[in-house]
């Protein structure tokens, strides 16, 4: 994502920020975790955090998949019903739109030349997922996977740098396809 025009390049822009509050939903925001361990596997693009709190072992895994075009976050616990959080995604740009429907939060907008869309989808195993005005709140789940997909209408082969394909639909399709794996 960048600002600029067809004749002048602008600056790189991020899509936005994802905020996950594990305490707001009565989730796994422990007081004084023990056996805290972080791992980074560069070969598999996997980051992992494991810790114990109140007799429960929590695992958080983060994976960036180029073939699937998603970033995946997976939260698990060794006891049922212990995963809970509130998540929101904020657009980094003024004038963008955020929508929360079903199990997804979407941000979209237009910069000087490029249009963009990012979608965060929550796939919960058990528990209850509730949509708010700007958040999704999960309570009492056994596990949860969050999938982030994003795209723009940029096409470097096009004379005006804009694609004619259904790039917005692809963002939603990518998350659905990755969620089925």
Residue ranges of each PLM-predicted region?
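Aromatic-residue-lined binding/catalytic grooves and analogous aromatic/hydrophobic interfacial grooves
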Residues: 1-181
């Amino acid at each position: 994502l960048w600002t600029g025009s067809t004749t002048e390049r602008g600056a790189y822009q991020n899509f936005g920020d994802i905020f996950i509050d594990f305490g707001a939903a009565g989730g796994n925001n422990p007081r004084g975790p023990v056996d805290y361990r972080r791992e980074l596997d560069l070969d598999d693009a996997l980051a992992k955090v494991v810790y114990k709190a109140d007799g429960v072992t929590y695992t958080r895994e983060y994976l960036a998949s180029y073939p699937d075009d998603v970033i995946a976050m997976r939260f698990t616990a060794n006891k049922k019903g212990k995963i809970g959080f509130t998540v929101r995604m904020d657009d980094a740009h003024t004038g963008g739109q955020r929508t929360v429907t079903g199990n997804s939060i979407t941000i979209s907008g237009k910069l000087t030349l490029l249009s963009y869309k990012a979608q965060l989808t929550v796939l919960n195993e058990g528990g209850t997922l509730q949509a708010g005005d700007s958040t999704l709140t999960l309570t009492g789940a056994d596990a949860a996977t969050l999938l982030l997909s994003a795209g723009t209408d940029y096409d470097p082969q096009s004379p005006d740098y804009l694609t004619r394909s259904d790039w917005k639909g692809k963002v939603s399709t990518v998350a659905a396809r990755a969620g089925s794996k």
